[in-house]
Amino acid sequence: MRAADALRAAVPRLAAAGIDEAARDARRLLAHAMAIDPARLTLHLPDPLPPEAAARFEAALAARAARQPVGQIVGERLFWGRRFRVTRDTLDPRPETEGLIEAALAEPFATVLDLGTGTGCIAVTLLAERPAAHGIATDLSPAALAVAAENAAALGVASRLELRLSDWFAAVPERVDLILSNPPYIAADEMAALAPEVRLWEPHLALSPGGDGLDAYRAIARGAPAHLRPGGRLLLEIGAAQGRAVAGLVEAAGLARVSVLPDLDGRDRLVSARLPAA
């Protein structure tokens, strides 16, 4: 069987399983099975598909038909132009989270704290973009911290990033220039409506704090003033309907210059605030 024939058969199979981007996902999984760069797949479609590659492709298709995310199947996800290892112990880095990176890089910083780091994509990216900066990244999951450590090492920032097992600020006595977080923010009653890729395959600890979805923001807002240097910034990713509530929590904690920033689709995506300089 040629690779092209395997791809042609795979697309309707994934579509029948409810995969919206069946052709895109089939191509990515075939490239993974053939151990080639996805950008070069078209050049190899006329090639015979070796039995071992065919077996890998079949296993990958079965996993995707069961709605496992492509990133988990291939073991990596692109974020800000870099490849990050992902597992079932971490959320896949989302394109919308790149808005946090863009906002963070708009001003200088020497020290950064990433709360609930997961894959480490936020902290690692910021340190890779700012070679003189140092950071701390926390998570409640030892397994997630292990993934973050792999990514920090692979992308050359391990010597400048300290990973800590911590419930938000519990293991962080320091003050920093910049605090960021993409915390769990799905309300308990919204979990059932999530896509199967998220609801069935990603860690619920990283998705929802339970209740109204705001508990993580309450904890971060309470702790941020004691962990920011004067003039330091807080950047939080939020759900589309949470802008007013999260901004209110941050203002009540004593931070200033609080604003809600939209994503490229015009939906509320970030809350930005600053500790007064004096």
UniProtKB/Swiss-Prot annotation:
Binding-site positions, S-adenosyl-L-methionine: 116-120, 139, 168, 182
Superkingdom: Bacteria
Keyword Nucleotide-binding: no
Gene from which the chain derives: prmC
Gene Ontology MF: a single term: nucleic acid binding
EC number: 2.1.1.297
Protein name: Release factor glutamine methyltransferase
Catalytic activity field: L-glutaminyl-[peptide chain release factor] + S-adenosyl-L-methionine = N(5)-methyl-L-glutaminyl-[peptide chain release factor] + S-adenosyl-L-homocysteine + H(+)
